[in-house]
């Protein structure tokens, strides 16, 4: 893939040899069924969708509102010769149809947002008028059937993306929802997902060395735990994994916990 070393996030991809968000990489490589559709919402450079295409042979829909980053995703798809199985939608997923302002973070290339408060003191970047719509509208021609993974990273607009799913927020439609929720959206997002029939898991707080050791065990076929059930009394900050309650993935994660002791 193309890497711009002037970008903080892409520089991280370069120096870690692509090992960016390793727990999410494990979800993609080990939990997404082979050939299942993947939606990478808030794609940035497209790294997660590209991993899904490479390791799971997944057809991928990339959603990226920033014009420069959307073009980067297109080039990365073309560099791999995957134009026939991947598409890029240059728009923002939301809960309503219309136009919006995308605020560019001048310092952090992964923190552009529809929320000016999210960008905060780094509001020195440009502003773009962009198209926004619920995901079912943006992907209206997506073949009906299960989506193996919906990854949402909308920089403070994640709850609106969830709300905009409508009938798509269904365990029969979505196999995995991977989303970052912050502030009051944690409580609202949890309630929305649980009402729809999903159960949540949060990332274990691990030091990098310990995380790498557990990943080596998992990729070697040994049991280890990267994600723990979200307790009823609290909702973690940051990235969370949601799967159909009582489904195969939930049982698999529970079995890993049991075997790992």
Where are these regions (language model features)?
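Phosphate/nucleotide-binding beta-alpha loop and adjacent structural elements of enzyme active sites
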Residues: 1-261
């Amino acid at each position: 893939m193309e890497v711009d070393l002037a970008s903080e996030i892409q520089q991280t991809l370069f120096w870690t040899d692509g090992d960016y968000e390793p727990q999410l990489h494990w979800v993609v490589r080990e939990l997404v069924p082979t050939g299942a559709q993947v939606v990478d919402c808030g794609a940035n450079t497209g790294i997660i969708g590209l991993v899904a295409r490479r390791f799971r042979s997944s057809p991928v829909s990339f959603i990226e509102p920033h014009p420069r980053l959307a073009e980067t995703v297109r080039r990365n798809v073309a560099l791999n010769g995957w134009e026939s199985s991947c598409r890029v939608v240059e728009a923002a997923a939301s809960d309503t149809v219309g136009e919006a302002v995308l605020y560019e973070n001048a310092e952090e290339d992964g923190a552009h947002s529809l929320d000016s408060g999210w960008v905060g003191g780094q509001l020195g970047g440009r502003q773009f008028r962009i198209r926004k719509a619920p995901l079912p509208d943006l992907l209206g021609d997506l073949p009906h059937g299960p989506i193996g993974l919906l990854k949402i990273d909308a920089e403070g607009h994640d709850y609106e993306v969830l709300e905009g799913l409508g009938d798509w927020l269904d365990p029969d439609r979505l196999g995995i929802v991977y989303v970052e929720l912050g502030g009051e959206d944690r409580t609202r997002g949890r309630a929305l997902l649980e009402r729809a029939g999903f159960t949540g898991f949060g990332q274990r707080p691990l030091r990098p060395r310990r995380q790498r050791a557990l990943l080596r065990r998992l990729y070697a076929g040994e049991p280890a735990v990267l994600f723990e059930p979200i307790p009823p009394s609290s909702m973690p900050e940051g990235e969370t994994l949601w799967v159909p309650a009582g489904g195969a993935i939930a049982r698999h994660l529970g079995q890993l916990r049991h075997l790992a002791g």
